[in-house]
Every structure is written in structure tokens, then in C-alpha cells.
UniProtKB/Swiss-Prot annotation:
GO cellular component terms, A-Z: cytoplasm; INTAC complex; integrator complex; nucleus; perinuclear region of cytoplasm
Similarity comment: Belongs to the Integrator subunit 13 family.
Name under which the protein is recorded: Protein asunder
Subcellular location field: Nucleus; Cytoplasm; Cytoplasm, Perinuclear region
């Protein structure tokens, strides 16, 4: 309830330095005649009025005062009566401009008080009594004072539980320091006073509320074109009670800096409404397009956008923050069926409330009109994402639903991502749900199967993805056969029936009978295609039995099926038991079969040739089921088997590292040794001679 932005205090430096000009000169417009001086020239600080009075410059105090008042105007427009802002002016002492009372939390009170304070005089004496520290001390004391909401919470909880009331705040100090050392001393003084204030607020004194945390923002402003020795610093944790950040900014840009800061302080977003048609002030017969920047809650954008939409952003000249660009949509009459559902409404306020485009847009909305705003999609088309309207003298932005809403008709289950799917096993799924229904028991049955066993392990969602469940519509006994396979309490009679059905399948395969698929249209298939169909049928049948093999009867069925496949010439792969179970979960029944590894070590030449011939025939028969990667990989393996392996692997014992280039340098050593052995003989012969 009491967030850190609940309390914000501005401390304005009212010392002599803030009476100097900001060095940004503003040209004066004349209704008649031409200005005598150059309006774009920039003069000295002392010549603020320019040549002939055609230009003037604001003081540092005026820039700081205007920007801080605009800050609180935005806060009070978007959070009326919920967020509180106070002002403290500091020179020889701290001057309180307003309090936490709702009667002083308004623009009229603050502006009248600022007029009475006035611009600091240049004739003030240079003294250490003029300091911003007085205002910082008063700001900490103001944070300890409760607001009306905190007073109501104190009345509900009682005086003994004041520590349970959150009390956080933010202090924005606008001053000017010489260097980083001065800033460091300012931070240390603020932290010390903060700790002292919490000591006074603790029992038994109980002078105010304990400050849980404070965020200090120091804005060091300088005239335009003047370099400062104070460096910028991002948010830094000074102590558990204090976080400090420092920004050095020129006086004309302080309004942009505060607008950037307020976006993060109150979780706001900036939106620029572009292409607003407006009559020209000079020529009423023509019109031009203008842009107006507004501020609102960030949720106005976050709840609207879906994955198919992007927010077009841009950075305005002179600013450092991004603004979302939305285009003015010409108002048109539309019925209730053409309106999109509204996801939320949020208060808005213009950034520059005194500009002519902003005032025209505000008056247009306050007169009862509504404005639709468009945003471009990624595909290039446009969508109406927001709407501006006014009610009760307040302007709201409405976030419209640009994706599928809950009020739209739900999409059909047959409209899948790959096209229209019409063969879902809906009736079988309903029967499976009824069969899998569980009821609680008062006493746990130790003989009951575990919960994981009760869950179905294999259930194709569509008929086209399964051969077994596709054929049960055309083979009368297949439905009963599949029901027996998944029974948890299979007995000997059920096993015998299943054995008979499996033998019938193999008899029909040996006779060359074609499986009654609906897509064959009664045409006679080739022998190889018929064998492929039976092979896939046996594979899916084996997978189904393997997943339900919980009794000895299921295991007997599995062994008989595997033996029949071996007799038929379609034996399953011999691999680890865990690997076959993993493949049964991960592979589809229609996936291509794996190739058997060729193990010919220690066999005779004739047996090797026969096994290679069988393997090649098997590969040729199953090449239609293999992918391109399998074909290329097998070709690379066959080529690599023809080449000799690296001699380092062949000659090096197991566990040792092979030496690279073992004969490198041996020839040079032999030459040196031979030369050394020949030289003494030559010397001996010369001596003898």
C-alpha cells in the first residue's frame, strides 16, 4: 500500500548561484515590425536581455522551479489524491512550501508559494549559512511525518504497532556542487541525519515514523555550455537505509531529465500521437499534422500487445527516453459489433500542457469526442490498439484487445496448426477417461497398482497416426483384441485368445493378404508395400504389449510375438532392455526402423559374405524408409572402414598418449654422431703421416 513513490520531496537550492542565467536565449515575437536584433544569437550571461531587448534567458532558479512543478503536475494528474509531493526551499534556513495535507497538495498553492519565494538575489552575501543542507535536514524530518493514509493505518493498528506501517520516500535535490568531493560530503551528511532521525523515532521518544528506506536523487545543474567536475553516477546503495544517484545536466535540459526520471519513479510510459490534423493558426483554410506526447501507466501498453504485435518506439530530439509512436485514426461511425473489448483504462496527461497542439487535443476530447490510435503490425498491416476519451473532466487511454479475446468463439479442435484435422479419436478418449476414473479409498489397498501404472502410456490422438487403431474399424476382432491387451488382470484364457489373434495376423501376412486401409480404395498393393505395412503393424503391436507388460501373461505374449517376427524374417533389434523401452516411448510407430549392426569379427569368409549380402539387401529394401542423413552417414562409415586407422591408436598401448612425429629430429642426431666419429680418425692419420 505505502510504496516508495508514496512520498516525494523536492529540495530546491535557493542560493546566490541560482540567480545566474541558464545561457539559453529565447527570441521574442513581435506582432508588428521586425526584431532589431538577431533572435538566434547567444550572448553573455550578463547581457541576458540581448540586443534591443529581442531575447532573454531564464535563470537557473526558474528552470529548476518550472521543471519540478511540471513533475508534480504529472503526478497529481495521474494519481489524484494517492501520491504526495512536497517542496522545500533552502537558503539560510529551510522554507516549507506545502505539507502532506490534501489542502496544500495542489498546483495553485505551490505556484503561489513559489511566487512569494521569488528568484534569489545576486546581491546576497557569500556565506556558509546559505546551503542546501538545511533543506535536506527538513526533508528527512518531513519523511518521518505521517500522511493521512498513514494516520488512518495508525488509528487501526494502535500506537504500539507503528513499526508495522511502511514508511519509504524519495528526495529529489536540485543543487549545484563544485566537484565529486562536495557530493560525497553531501551524501555522508544526509545518511548521518537519516540515522539520527530514526533514532529519535524509535522508542521511547517516538518522534514520528521510522524511515524504512530513502531514495536520494541529486540533480547537479549548470548553465548551458559549462562543464561540470561532478560525474554522473547510477543508483548506488550507500547503506541499508539509503540509495543515491547523481545526474549532471544543463539547466535547459532539466525538464527532459525529470520526465525521464518520472517514468521509472511511477512506472509510466510515453506515447506520442502523430499525424493529428489541425488548422493552421496563421491560415485557417489549411491544416497541418502535429504530434502530441502524453504520459500514462505502463500497463496501457503491456496488456495490449501480444506476440504478433510490436511497439514502434522513437527518441524525441533533446530527450533520452523512448516514446511509443501511435498514429491518429480518423474518427468514423461504427456499430457495437465493430468495437473491440477494452482491457483497461488509465489516466493520461500531456507532457507540454501549454503547447497549442496539446490544448487542441485536450479540448477535442473534453468536448465528448473519442480518438482511435493505430499501431503497425509486424506484417505491415495496422491495428487499432488504443482509444482516447474523456469522462468527468478526466482523459483516459483505453487499451483495446487486438488479439483473440475470451468473448470470441473458441477455435474448433479440428483446426490444427498443420491444417484441418478431422480424425481425432474423440469417442475413444471419452472411454479412456471413464476407464481411468479414480475414487478415494478410506483404507489404502497394498495390492492396488501404483498411480503411474494406472495412467495410459500409449494413446494416439488421431487415427491416421496409428495402424492398429485405424484397422479396428475394418477388422471385427481387433477391438476386442486391443481391449484384452491393456487389461491389468489378464488371465490364461485371455492369453490364449490373444495368441490366436496374433497367429491369424501372421497367417494373413504369409498368404499375402492386404490390410484393409481406407486410402487404398481396394487396389492391389505391391508385395513390398504390403510387407512394410505388416512390419509397421507388428512393431506397433509389440510396443503396445511392451508398455502394458505387467503380468506374466503379457510377457508370454511379448515373447511369442518376438519369436513369430523372427520366424517371419522381421526379428527385432537386440539391444539393451532400457534402450528398447526408451525407443518405445520416444519413437512413433511410423518411424523408420533402425539398421542392425554388422558384427563379423571372428567369422569365416563365407559367413561374412552372406551376412554382408543380407545386410545390403535389408538396406536396399528399407532405403525408402531411411532419411537422407542416414544414407550419407552409412556411406561415410563404409568409406572410413576402407582406410587404415591412425598409427598412434594402433601402436600405442591402452592408457598412454601417442607421441606426435616420433622420428622428428633423429636424422640430424645421426648426422652429428657420424661426423663426430669420423673426425678423430682423420687426425690420427695426419699424425702418423
Amino acid at each position: 500500500m505505502f510504496e516508495r513513490n508514496q512520498k516525494t520531496i523536492f529540495v530546491l537550492d535557493h542560493t546566490r548561484y541560482f540567480s545566474i542565467a541558464s545561457e539559453e536565449y529565447i527570441s521574442m515575437d513581435f506582432l508588428k515590425g521586425k526584431p532589431s536584433g538577431d533572435g538566434g544569437a547567444t550572448g553573455a550571461a550578463g547581457n541576458a536581455t540581448g540586443s534591443g531587448g529581442s531575447q532573454f534567458s531564464k535563470s537557473l532558479w526558474t528552470c529548476a522551479c518550472e521543471s519540478s512543478i511540471e513533475y508534480c503536475r504529472v503526478v497529481w494528474d495521474l494519481f489524484p489524491g494517492k501520491k504526495h509531493v512536497r517542496f522545500i526551499v533552502s537558503d539560510t534556513a529551510a522554507h516549507i512550501v506545502n505539507t502532506w495535507s490534501p489542502s496544500t497538495q495542489n498546483m495553485s498553492h505551490v505556484m503561489n508559494a513559489m511566487v512569494m519565494v521569488g528568484v534569489p538575489s545576486r546581491n546576497l552575501p557569500t556565506s556558509s549559512d546559505y546551503s542546501v543542507i538545511h533543506g535536506l535536514r527538513a526533508a528527512i524530518e518531513a519523511l518521518a511525518e505521517p500522511t493521512d493514509e498513514q494516520l488512518a493505518a495508525m488509528a487501526d493498528l494502535g500506537t504500539d504497532e507503528l513499526s508495522r506501517i511502511p514508511n519509504k520516500g524519495r528526495v529529489i535535490c536540485i543543487t549545484s556542487a563544485r566537484d565529486n568531493t562536495s557530493m560525497k560530503s553531501l551524501e555522508d551528511i544526509f545518511n548521518t541525519v537519516l540515522v539520527q532521525q530514526n533514532t529519535l523515532a524509535a522508542p521511547p521518544a517516538k518522534k514520528g515514523l521510522i524511515i524504512d528506506h530513502c531514495h536520494l536523487v541529486i540533480l547537479n545543474i549548470v548553465p548551458l555550455g559549462v562543464e561540470s567536475l561532478v560525474t554522473n553516477r547510477s543508483l548506488l546503495k550507500i547503506s541499508p537505509l539509503l540509495d543515491v544517484e547523481i545526474h549532471t545536466v544543463s539547466a535547459p535540459d532539466i525538464s527532459y531529465k525529470l520526465t525521464h526520471l518520472i517514468l521509472n519513479h511511477y512506472d509510466l510510459a510515453s506515447t506520442t500521437v502523430t499525424n493529428i490534423p489541425m488548422k493552421e493558426e496563421q491560415n485557417a483554410n489549411s491544416s497541418a499534422n502535429y504530434d502530441v506526447e502524453i504520459l500514462h501507466s505502463r500497463r496501457a501498453h503491456s496488456i495490449t500487445c501480444g506476440p504478433d504485435f510490436s511497439l514502434p518506439t522513437s527518441i524525441k530530439q533533446g530527450a533520452t527516453y523512448e516514446t511509443v509512436t501511435l498514429k491518429w485514426c480518423t474518427p468514423r461511425g461504427c456499430g457495437s459489433a465493430d468495437l473491440q473489448p477494452c482491457l483497461g483504462q488509465f489516466l493520461v496527461t500531456p507532457v507540454d500542457v501549454t503547447s497549442r497542439p496539446s490544448s487542441c487535443l485536450i479540448n477535442f476530447l473534453l468536448n465528448g469526442r473519442s480518438v482511435l490510435l493505430e499501431m503497425p503490425r509486424k506484417t505491415g498491416s495496422k491495428a487499432t490498439s488504443h482509444m482516447l476519451s474523456a469522462r468527468g473532466g478526466e482523459i483516459f487511454v483505453h487499451s483495446l484487445c487486438i488479439t483473440r479475446s475470451c468473448m470470441d468463439e473458441a477455435p474448433s479442435i479440428t483446426d490444427g496448426p498443420g491444417g484441418r484435422v478431422s480424425d481425432y479419436r474423440t469417442a475413444e478418449l471419452g472411454q479412456l477417461i471413464k476407464m481411468s476414473r479414480m475414487v478415494p479409498l478410506k483404507v489404502k489397498d497394498p495390492s492396488a497398482p501404483p498411480l503411474t501404472r494406472r495412467l495410459p502410456r500409449y494413446f494416439p490422438l488421431t487415427t491416421s497416426s496409428s495402424i492398429l487403431f485405424h484397422l479396428q474399424r475394418h477388422i471385427s476382432w481387433l477391438s476386442h483384441f486391443l481391449h484384452l491387451l491393456v487389461k491389468e488382470d489378464m488371465d490364461k484364457q485371455d492369453e490364449v485368445r490373444c495368441q490366436q489373434h496374433i497367429h491369424e495376423l501372421y497367417k494373413s501376412a504369409s498368404r499375402g493378404d492386404v490390410l484393409p486401409f481406407t486410402h487404398t480404395n481396394g487396389a492391389r498393393l505391391k508385395l513390398s508395400k504390403a510387407k512394410d505395412q505388416y512390419r509397421l503393424l507388428y512393431r506397433e503391436l509389440e510396443q503396445l504389449i511392451q508398455l502394458n507388460a505387467t503380468t506374466m501373461h503379457h510377457k508370454n505374449l511379448l515373447e511369442s510375438l518376438q519369436s513369430l517376427r523372427a520366424a517371419y524374417g522381421d526379428a527385432p533389434l537386440k539391444s539393451e532392455p532400457g534402450a528398447s523401452l526408451l525407443r518405445s516411448f520416444t519413437e512413433s510407430p511410423l518411424s523408420p526402423e533402425r539398421l542392425e549392426p554388422i558384427s563379423s569379427v571372428g567369422a569365416s569368409g563365407s559367413s561374412n559374405s552372406n551376412s554382408l549380402l543380407k545386410a545390403s539387401k535389408r538396406r536396399m529394401s528399407s532405403c525408402g524408409q531411411r532419411s537422407l542423413l542416414d544414407i550419407i552417414s552409412s556411406a561415410e562409415r563404409s568409406q572410413s572402414n576402407k582406410r587404415l586407422d591412425f598409427s598412434g591408436r594402433l601402436c600405442t598401448p591402452l592408457g598412454q598418449v601417442a607421441k606426435l612425429y616420433p622420428d622428428f629430429g633423429t636424422k640430424d642426431k645421426d648426422a652429428v654422431t657420424t661426423g663426430a666419429s669420423i673426425t678423430p680418425n682423420v687426425k690420427e692419420e695426419s699424425v702418423r703421416s
